[in-house]
Amino acid sequence: MRRRFLFALAATWLAAPTLQAANGQSPFVLGIAPHTSARVILEMYQPLRRYLEAALQRPVEVRTAPDFTEFARRALNDEYDLAVTTGHQARLFQSDAGYLPLLTYRADFKAVALVDRKGPYQDIAALRGSTVLGLSPTSLVTLWGQRWLRLQNLGDVTIRYVSAADSVSRLVLAGDASLAFTSLANYQKLPPEQREQLRILAESEPMAGRVYVLNRRWVARQKSIEQSLWSFAASPAGLAYLTQNQLDGYRRLRPRELEAMDPYAAEVRQVVLGR
């Protein structure tokens, strides 16, 4: 309950000035998958929020969710106007709720398995009987990690889920888990002194990373909204955002890039909808 209150409080605090200036106009909701803490997300997407607000001439709010599963539920319930999430959820939102894929980042998205560089889990066999960490059961890095574990035939590994991506590495270094699954981007953003204590035991092939998908109710303005995103990427604020987060700019989705995520999307559907 307290976490939900903090999410709402943070979103309200950041959006309040724009709502006051909007003369009661309903906000355009930018939904960001919880790839890191709510505080970091709300700060990270302020440049895009401000740019879209000016382009759309209406208030824009940044919202996230406590975990990836709840984020998917909210998106499928049409709570977001523009959602930014990893490719498997983007595919689910497209196929099940009619969201319109717009673009993604140029930088590769990869999942990684992290261990303590000086810990006892320096090879795959050592993981047998241990506890590993994922985010929520529907995050792409966790789904990849669970498939990777099955391929290793370890059998009795326990998977524990945590809600904050920036805490999994600390838990591994504290000895609370043998290994943690996270994204390569989140690993690269760790403080240098923390990153140096970790080692990548396994790394995925590139997958469809964070994808921008537009709610179908905005189909009439799809072209203008997409153009606003491209213009943001070329602006000083956009260039700073893309550089700071090592995203290399935007790109169009490749043919069938999202369709390739169908197996992962099906796993999310099973968890969220029970089918």
Language model: regions and residue ranges:
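Extracytoplasmic small-molecule ligand-binding "clamshell" domains
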Residues: 23-88
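A structural signal for short loop-to-beta-strand junctions that line the ligand-binding cleft
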Residues: 97-106, 201
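Short helix-initiation/N-cap motifs at beta->coil->alpha
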Residues: 62-73, 86, 158-170, 206-208
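Periplasmic-binding protein-like
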Residues: 26-35, 41, 107-115, 193-233, ...
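Flexible hinge/capping segments at coil-to-helix
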Residues: 115-132
